[in-house]
């Protein structure tokens, strides 16, 4: 085999091995099995929202595993195709192998981006808000164009979209819209879209056909996950027992059945004395403590989300321009990635921008 080709094939295989390691195929298979078991429950659809989330996560993770298996098979098949074509002197076979090698590189690069999503919230679903900014009716129309772009992107990947709110402008377009993309890693992927987007075109709303510049802001936040159960390590609590007391402080129990639990890391204290036994009072107190810790956790998450809103990727940062006139070009101002077909981009073909943005963000974090 040609040494350059052999080295290239080895690099492709090594890249795939790295992806398989980061994505942890054993853990991925275990998660799929867990979701399949959940999806098979007869009472699953009693909670429609939960059922839809389980179904979406199952489809997404099955797709991830299938992609990796397909890529592994393609790497192996490509090596065989090169060997057979070289042995038989088949030029058309070699040309086919070269073409497949180029495609395989591109597909591996796209999947490799997924391994860069390792932030605290990256694995979560996303809530996207789009608002018209400067530019009047053109800005409102642009906001609607952007919403369609993201919805089409989600549809291309078979990600469910749930629209929370749309506020329509008087003449055309949207004042604002908020929607949720129900797919794992939607936040990590779409968060690079946060910022101000700029549109330059001949305005369809201008009677004189003048060129107009308008702006729309995109905000991307992770979905706060509901937690049904809070684990409390035994080492994190101190349990004190005392006699139950009634009106006026008088003892109503001759045994020390009442329980007071102190959560050492937070200082939260709860007590229970209404149950008949110490074990029952402890169990009840633990349930109260779990509720208090869950409420505290959600308060902290809300504060963290507020901090994300004020992070560097703010609304005021112009990050992409969509030029429809006098030439046609969509260009990311951070990564320099550009596409000369705005129609395709506005129809949801934005994976190139997302991949470039994720790589750029990783470089910025490492700097």
Swiss-Prot record:
N5-methylglutamine: residues carrying this PTM: 250
GO cellular component assignments: cytoplasm
Pfam families in UniProt: PCRF (PF03462), RF-1 (PF00472)
Record PTM: Methylated by PrmC. Methylation increases the termination efficiency of RF2.
SMART domains: PCRF
Alphabetized GO MF terms: translation release factor activity, codon specific
Compartmental location: Cytoplasm
Major place of residence: cytoplasm
Keywords attached to this entry: Cytoplasm, Methylation, Protein biosynthesis
Gene3D superfamilies, per the entry: 3.30.160.20, 3.30.70.1660, Release factor (1.20.58.410)
InterPro entries on file: PCRF (IPR005139), Pep_chain_release_fac_I (IPR000352), Pep_chain_release_fac_I_sf (IPR045853), PrfB (IPR004374)
Family: Belongs to the prokaryotic/mitochondrial release factor family.
HAMAP family: Rel_fac_2
Function per UniProt: Peptide chain release factor 2 directs the termination of translation in response to the peptide chain termination codons UGA and UAA.
Record protein name field: Peptide chain release factor 2
Lineage, highest ranks first: Bacteria, Bacillati, Actinomycetota, Actinomycetes, Pseudonocardiales
Gene name per UniProt: prfB
């Amino acid at each position: 085999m040609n040494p350059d080709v052999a080295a290239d094939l080895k690099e492709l295989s090594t890249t795939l091995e790295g992806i398989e390691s980061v994505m942890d195929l054993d853990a991925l298979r275990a998660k799929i099995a867990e979701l399949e078991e959940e999806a098979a429950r007869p009472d699953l659809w009693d909670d429609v929202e939960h059922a839809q989330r389980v179904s979406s996560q199952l489809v997404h993770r099955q797709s991830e595993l299938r992609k990796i298996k397909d890529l592994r098979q393609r790497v192996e098949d490509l090596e065989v195709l090169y060997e057979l074509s070289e042995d038989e002197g088949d030029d058309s076979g070699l040309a086919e192998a070269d073409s497949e090698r180029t495609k395989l590189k591109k597909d591996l690069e796209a999947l490799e981006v997924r391994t860069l999503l390792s932030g605290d919230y990256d694995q979560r679903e996303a809530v996207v808000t789009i608002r018209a900014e400067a530019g009047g009716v053109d800005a409102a129309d642009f906001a609607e164009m952007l919403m369609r772009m993201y919805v089409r992107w989600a549809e291309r990947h078979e990600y469910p979209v749930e629209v929370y709110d749309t506020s329509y402008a008087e003449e055309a377009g949207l004042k604002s819209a908020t929607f949720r993309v129900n797919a794992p890693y939607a936040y990590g992927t779409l968060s690079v879209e946060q910022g101000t987007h700029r549109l330059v075109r001949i305005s369809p709303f201008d009677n004189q056909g003048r060129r107009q510049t308008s702006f729309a802001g995109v905000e991307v936040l992770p979905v706060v996950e509901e937690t049904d159960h809070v684990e409390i390590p035994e080492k994190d609590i101190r349990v004190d027992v005392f006699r139950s007391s009634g009106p006026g402080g008088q003892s109503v129990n001759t045994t020390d059945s009442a329980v007071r639990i102190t959560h050492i890391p937070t200082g939260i204290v709860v007590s229970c004395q209404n149950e008949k036994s110490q074990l029952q009072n402890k169990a009840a107190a633990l349930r109260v403590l779990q509720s208090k810790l869950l409420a505290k956790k959600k308060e902290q998450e809300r504060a963290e989300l507020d901090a994300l809103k004020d992070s560097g990727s703010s609304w005021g940062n112009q990050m992409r321009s969509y030029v429809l006139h006098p030439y046609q070009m969509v260009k990311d101002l951070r990564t320099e990635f550009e596409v000369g077909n705005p129609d395709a981009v506005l129809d949801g073909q934005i994976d190139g921008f997302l991949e470039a943005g994720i790589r750029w963000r990783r470089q910025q974090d490492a700097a």
